[in-house]
């Protein structure tokens, strides 16, 4: 499935960059609260990743990177989640997702399910390698695939719909 979509590459000197990043940080405050109503909803659906993927693909890697770096920290400070010990790994994984999504959209200038699948797989691989470097293990990355596959599908389909229709 290919869609004609408006994709942007916003720069750091544009107010829109920070406006959209702030909107995505707020979304990343609200969405996890909804998913945490479902038992293990945060682990299964990884709601922060959905917002970062859609935001970075639609508005560029800079918007995605700002939101990826700010969202886990703001969430932790306001809600206590994610736990402090997983904050560095989660932030790294979200940053890899933002960079991969933004650069892919910038290069291909279109949104397809196949491209989004590739983005998620590359981001999971680089995030897993980062987790290995930071913690010495890749348990959470393996969990992302074994428990979190519904969330990976939601990210791909959700980002596709956001990028295509918004």
For each feature predicted by the language model, list its residue ranges.
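Hydrophobic transmembrane alpha-helices
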Residues: 2-55, 62-63
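Membrane-interface helix-boundary motifs at transmembrane edges
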Residues: 8-13, 103-112
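Membrane-helix interface segments
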Residues: 17, 61-65, 107-113
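Aromatic-anchored segments of alpha-helical transmembrane domains
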Residues: 25-34, 70-80, 120-129
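Membrane-embedded alpha-helical hairpins and interfacial helices in multi-pass inner-membrane proteins
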Residues: 37-42, 81-91, 96, 106-166
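Hydrophobic alpha-helical segments within and immediately flanking transmembrane helices
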Residues: 50-51, 71-75, 94-101
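Helix-capping/transition residues at the boundaries of transmembrane alpha-helices
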Residues: 55-56, 105
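Short hydrophobic alpha-helical segments that form membrane-spanning helices or hydrophobic packing faces
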Residues: 65-70, 158
């Amino acid at each position: 499935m290919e869609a004609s979509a408006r994709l942007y590459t916003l720069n750091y000197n544009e107010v829109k960059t920070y406006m959209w990043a702030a909107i995505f940080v707020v979304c990343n405050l609200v969405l996890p609260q909804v998913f945490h109503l479902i038992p293990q909803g945060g682990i299964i659906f990884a709601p922060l990743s959905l917002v970062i993927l859609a935001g970075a693909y639609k508005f560029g890697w800079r918007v995605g990177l700002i939101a990826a770096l700010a969202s886990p920290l703001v969430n932790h400070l306001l809600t206590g989640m994610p736990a402090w010990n997983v904050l560095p790994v989660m932030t790294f994984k979200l940053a890899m997702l933002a960079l991969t999504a933004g650069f892919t959209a910038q290069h291909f200038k279109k949104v397809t399910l196949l491209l989004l699948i590739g983005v998620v797989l590359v981001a999971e691989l680089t995030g897993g390698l980062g987790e290995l470097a930071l913690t010495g293990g890749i348990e959470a990355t393996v969990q992302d695939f074994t428990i979190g596959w519904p969330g990976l599908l939601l990210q791909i389909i959700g980002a596709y719909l956001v990028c295509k229709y918004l």
